[in-house]
Amino acid sequence: MEEGLLVRKIREGTVIDHIPAGRALNVLKILGLTGREGLTIAVVMNVPSRKLGVKDIVKVEKRFLEPSEVDKIALIAPSATINIIRDFQVASKRRVEPPAVVTGILRCPNPNCVTNSEREPVTPRFVRVSLSPLKLKCAYCEETLSEAEIVDQLVSPYG
């Protein structure tokens, strides 16, 4: 089989590579991309990968990521790489890493946690306890969040 480009190169923008298969649409949700922004967006799913077996790729022309967006992507795609493209060339490339401490992005699933009290507004805070599989622990009640729970919260409209 002849190998070639599935999607053309982009002039300026961001390529998010090495996304676990099936999570590209979650990445789009996290970035708030619906396809109505006027940006050229390419989503390639289930591409063969030596590193992951299969992977997803997201290319977004004329869009660069904020650090908070990179942190969220790292929580659902810890193996991802972010490539910044300028004039059709990779200007920078870096692997994401889930943050050691996550504040204000996720909510604690423990209804008795102080962060869920209406009387006492406390910002939820989680500490990373494991990278593979990704697990976070509430800094207040020590309830843990699995990778699946993290993904659900980040892509849920109620998250």
UniProtKB/Swiss-Prot annotation:
One of its GO terms (cellular component) is aspartate carbamoyltransferase complex. The keyword Transferase does not apply. Pfam families: PyrI, PyrI_C. It comes from the Archaea. Its cofactor is Zn(2+). Gene3D superfamilies: Aspartate carbamoyltransferase regulatory subunit, C-terminal domain, Aspartate carbamoyltransferase regulatory subunit, N-terminal domain. SUPFAM superfamilies: Aspartate carbamoyltransferase, Regulatory-chain, C-terminal domain, Aspartate carbamoyltransferase, Regulatory-chain, N-terminal domain. Keywords: Metal-binding, Pyrimidine biosynthesis, Zinc. One of its GO terms (biological process) is pyrimidine nucleotide biosynthetic process. HAMAP family: Asp_carb_tr_reg. Contains catalytic and regulatory chains. NCBIfam families: ATCase_reg. Involved in allosteric regulation of aspartate carbamoyltransferase. PANTHER family: ASPARTATE CARBAMOYLTRANSFERASE REGULATORY CHAIN. Belongs to the PyrI family. This is Aspartate carbamoyltransferase regulatory chain. It comes from Thermofilum pendens (strain DSM 2475 / Hrk 5). The lineage of its organism: Archaea, Thermoproteota, Thermoprotei, Thermofilales, Thermofilaceae.
